């Protein structure tokens, strides 16, 4: 597609140390008072899932340079600061064929979207104008908003401690620990709430395009660096953590940088490229096993969160529905886990070049034991 041109050469990055992350616990237990439910619970029905959805290519684009970027302010509440003159130039450059990451003609996309922030909407508008389509429809989705900073709102991005505290929660969520809080945030209090918010926006974009699609289709969404990178790393089947941490040293994503994913809400998502660097579809053995364990851990956390939300709402029907859905989701994750691990191991053996199947199996067993 037009938005995926030849690779750009990555800038050299400083040495970095990747901290080991322990995959502890398989879920979150919510301690809550018992709420009476009218009548007995219905029988729990387990449904089979058919993976037959059409794939979408989604280009997630960070906004152009904003006044907050220039002043070094963490601003995560809409409407936020506008873009600068340089930011407007960056947005217009997205329509230039000389840009290695230039976007396709607006008419190519099934939908063009932006968050509630001024900076994303201005970036989209300036690109559309430069592409000769100033009147092209632009849909606004609050789910695409920046990852909320909580108590860090308005603090300096140049303060390394503040920047680190802002990323503690998101980094934990990427490794399956959705329960870790985002300090002081009522918008994104934890990974479950953020997953629901941004994931619902992506699903809405998908549904809008899939309505009339007989085959694959594409959409573009203008969002923010932290929300784009966090949700993508939480959800894709082939997360490239080395590439992520290298980009983290440079601010995660540059202004108008892009992350491209492909897939659908039913079968899941694959990372295609990160800021112009293509990503292998097969994540490799260790990353594949990590994703299998991550998916197993996430299911009970999401179920527990939705049940807790229903309990707080106090509607017995909502509580019953949350229990039903949560049970089905956790059971599906537990049932799918053994086969997912087997598929990951056999896939790694098939892709291992120059080594025997026994060596590959030994590596797999060592990874599981470690």
Identify the function of each model-found stretch.
Residues 92, 118-122, 192, 196-199, ...:
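A structural signal for well-ordered alpha-helical segments within the folded catalytic domains
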Residues 66-71, 149-150, 230:
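Short acidic/His/Gly/Ser-rich catalytic and metal-binding motifs that mark active-site loops
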Residues 130-200:
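Phosphate-handling substructures
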């Amino acid at each position: 597609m037009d938005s995926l041109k030849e690779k750009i050469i990555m800038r050299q990055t400083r040495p970095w140390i990747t901290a080991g992350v322990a995959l502890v616990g398989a879920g979150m237990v919510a301690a809550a008072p018992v709420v009476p439910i009218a009548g007995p619970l219905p029988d729990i029905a387990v449904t089979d899932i058919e993976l037959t959805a059409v794939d979408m290519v989604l280009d997630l684009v960070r906004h152009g340079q904003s006044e907050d970027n220039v002043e070094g302010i963490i601003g995560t509440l809409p409407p936020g600061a506008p873009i600068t003159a340089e930011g407007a130039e960056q947005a217009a450059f997205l329509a230039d064929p000389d840009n290695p990451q230039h976007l396709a003609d607006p008419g190519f996309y099934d939908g063009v979207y932006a968050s509630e922030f001024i900076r994303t909407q201005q970036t989209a508008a300036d690109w559309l104008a430069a592409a000769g389509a100033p009147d092209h429809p632009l849909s606004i989705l609050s789910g695409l908003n920046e990852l909320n900073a909580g108590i860090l709102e308005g603090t300096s991005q140049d303060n390394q401690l503040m920047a680190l505290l802002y990323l503690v929660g998101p980094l934990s969520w990427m490794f399956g620990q959705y329960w870790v809080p985002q300090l002081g945030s009522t918008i994104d209090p934890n990974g479950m709430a953020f997953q629901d918010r941004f994931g619902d926006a992506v699903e809405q974009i998908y549904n809008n395009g899939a309505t009339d699609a007989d085959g694959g289709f594409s959409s573009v969404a203008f969002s923010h660096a932290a929300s784009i990178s966090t949700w993508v790393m939480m959800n894709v089947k082939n997360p490239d953590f080395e590439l992520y941490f290298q980009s983290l040293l440079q601010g995660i994503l540059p202004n108008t940088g892009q992350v491209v994913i492909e897939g659908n809400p039913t079968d899941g998502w694959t990372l295609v490229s990160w800021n112009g660097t293509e990503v292998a579809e097969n994540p490799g053995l260790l990353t594949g096993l990590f994703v299998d364990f991550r998916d197993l851990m996430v299911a009970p956390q999401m179920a527990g969160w939705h049940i807790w939300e229903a309990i707080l709402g106090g509607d017995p029907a909502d509580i019953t529905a949350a229990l039903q859905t949560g049970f089905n989701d956790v059971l599906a994750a537990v049932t799918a886990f053994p086969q997912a691990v087997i598929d990951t191991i056999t896939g790694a053996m098939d892709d291992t070049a120059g080594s025997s199947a026994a060596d590959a199996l030994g590596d797999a067993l060592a990874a599981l034991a470690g």
